[in-house]
A protein has these predicted regions:
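A hydrophobic, helix-centered structural microdomain
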Residues: 254-317, 354, 429-463
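Juxtamembrane loop-helix boundary motifs flanking transmembrane segments in multi-pass membrane proteins
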Residues: 2, 6, 44, 71-75, ...
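Short, glycine-rich, amphipathic interfacial segments at transmembrane boundaries or analogous
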Residues: 225-226, 232-233, 294-333, 394-412
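N-terminal hydrophobic signal-anchor/signal peptide
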Residues: 1-23, 27, 130-274, 444-463
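C-terminal terminal-structure detector
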Residues: 382-463
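A short, structured surface patch at a secondary-structure boundary
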Residues: 328-390, 429-433
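Signature of alpha-helical transmembrane segments in polytopic membrane proteins
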Residues: 1-138, 438
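Membrane-cytosol interface motif
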Residues: 86, 90, 142-157, 291-314, ...
């Protein structure tokens, strides 16, 4: 097993190095073939170390963005996700590099070579990802897993793992009724890993320690207490480890820094986005003559209510019956214009005003309507944990989940953010939010047959 992991890491390192060298090679091509000769006209001469520095800066920035967006995660992400990550990384890096060369030149430079380079990089990236993934899958086929489960239906977890057949293959399922000895014997049969699903905490811990002692890989879905403990602070006061879970999610310093970032970024983005907001407002008004903005009561930190602002994407009489409901798949209430602005998130731009006013933050759990929260709280009281921090324009659950992710799973994702908060995490999530704008599944509506708030999920935390 250890040899497999070592080989996998070495292969990914080799594949990543080939991809990085090729991308830097494209940049070196336009640098030496076009931009450096132009600079020489102005008697600006670089020696060997200068050229190395130019290429090194490009390499470091490209690596940082590729690592952030997942552009080097061959075998971990789906090929299309890796390619999309490469696209975002290259756009960010090439825009920054363009202005870097413009500063060296002293004014704006001819951008066509950058466009040619970008086209070449994207073509190479697509070919590189295809063959890299092909080689990776040939050497490292999907892991064969054993699923151990409790009384609850395993249909949901099987569906989740089936969505990644390229990585996982659940070949056998055993229930707890088989008995501990039978489970221990089965786990010893050389599976690529064991999945623990819907198992009482005491039994889960016993299985976990057994697998850990025998170096068996474990996949488990954390419960809410697990997420809280994972984010706790470790103290070294005595001769035994102590974990501290603070009474407030963010410290005073963290709240001040977070608020300063919100004010500065919202002002900058309001200026940049104002032309798009004006055009959107005009189009909505011309379409049906209804109001441009849509106000809705939502809840933020401590359950405090505020009026969230959005560009209207539904018919004026979308909730004429007075019943609060989430958007469903293929919802007939959404207008054609609304469908587009929801897909590219333009409908969310007015919330920059909410952020500037201090009602929301850029990053945090998405604010829910009081009526929806009341429904969730009846079946899952822990849903109130999300209000320990200010609501956000985007959050952990939006980056790593979907619109129709169950409230229980959203809660675990939001708690992961709350318990792991840092300024760097906020910046990282802001950058990752750009990526999900082009991920269709993140804007899916809720399936009418989907069970959204499951009391059974919350009850499992108490077992």
């Amino acid at each position: 097993m250890k040899d497999r992991e070592t080989g996998k890491r070495l292969l990914i390192l080799l594949i990543s190095a080939i991809g990085m060298l090729a991308m830097v090679g494209f940049y070196a091509w336009i640098w030496f073939g076009f931009y450096y000769p132009k600079i020489l006209i102005y008697d600006i001469k670089l020696y060997f170390n200068g050229h190395i520095l130019i290429l090194l800066i490009y390499t470091v920035i490209l690596f940082l963005f590729s690592n952030l967006y997942g552009g080097l995660k061959i075998g971990y992400l789906k090929p299309m996700e890796v390619f999309l990550s490469q696209v975002f990384s290259l756009i960010c890096v090439n825009v920054m590099s363009y202005f870097q060369l413009a500063l060296i030149h002293g004014n704006l430079i001819w951008p066509v070579p950058f466009f040619r380079m970008m086209a070449g990089q994207l073509v190479f990236s697509a070919v590189w990802i295809y063959f890299a993934n092909l080689i990776y899958r040939r050497i490292f086929p999907p892991r064969k897993l054993l699923l151990i489960h409790g009384d609850r239906s395993i249909e949901d977890i099987l569906h989740k793992f089936a969505s990644r057949k390229d990585k996982y293959n659940i070949v056998k399922c055993l229930g707890l009724e088989e008995g501990a000895e039978a489970l221990f014997d089965e786990m010893e049969k050389g599976y690529g890993g064991v999945v623990l699903w819907d198992i009482p905490t005491a039994v889960r811990n016993k299985l976990l320690k057994y697998c850990y002692s025998r170096s068996i890989r474990i996949y488990l879905m954390p419960k809410i207490p697990d997420v809280i403990i994972k984010g706790s602070e470790q103290l070294h006061l005595f001769d035994t480890p102590i974990l501290l879970t603070r009474e407030s999610a963010l410290t005073v310093e963290q709240r001040i820094i977070k608020r300063c970032i919100d004010i500065v970024c919202s002002l900058i983005l309001l200026v940049i986005a104002s032309p798009f907001m004006l055009v959107t407002a005009i189009i909505i008004k011309l379409y049906d003559g209804g109001p441009v903005l849509y106000k809705q009561i939502r809840c933020t930190r401590g359950g405090k209510e505020f009026a969230i602002l959005k560009f209207r994407s539904m018919r004026v009489d979308a909730e004429k019956d007075g019943v609060a409901r989430l958007a469903a798949k293929n919802d007939s209430r959404i207008t054609p214009i609304g469908r587009f602005i929801r897909a590219v998130r333009i409908d969310e731009l007015p919330q920059l005003i909410n952020i500037l006013k201090g009602e929301m933050s850029f990053i945090g759990p998405r604010p829910e309507r009081p009526e929806i929260i009341a429904q969730y709280l009846e079946e899952m009281p822990e849903f109130a944990f999300r209000t320990k921090v200010k609501a956000g324009l985007a959050g952990y659950a939006q980056v790593y989940g979907k619109y129709n992710t169950t409230p229980y799973d959203k809660l675990k994702l939001d708690l992961t953010y709350i318990e792991s908060y840092s300024v760097w995490l906020d910046i990282k999530l802001m950058l990752l939010t750009l990526k999900i704008l082009f991920r269709p599944e993140s804007t899916e509506g809720v399936d009418e047959k989907q069970i959204t708030a499951m009391k059974q999920d919350a009850q499992e935390d108490d077992e």
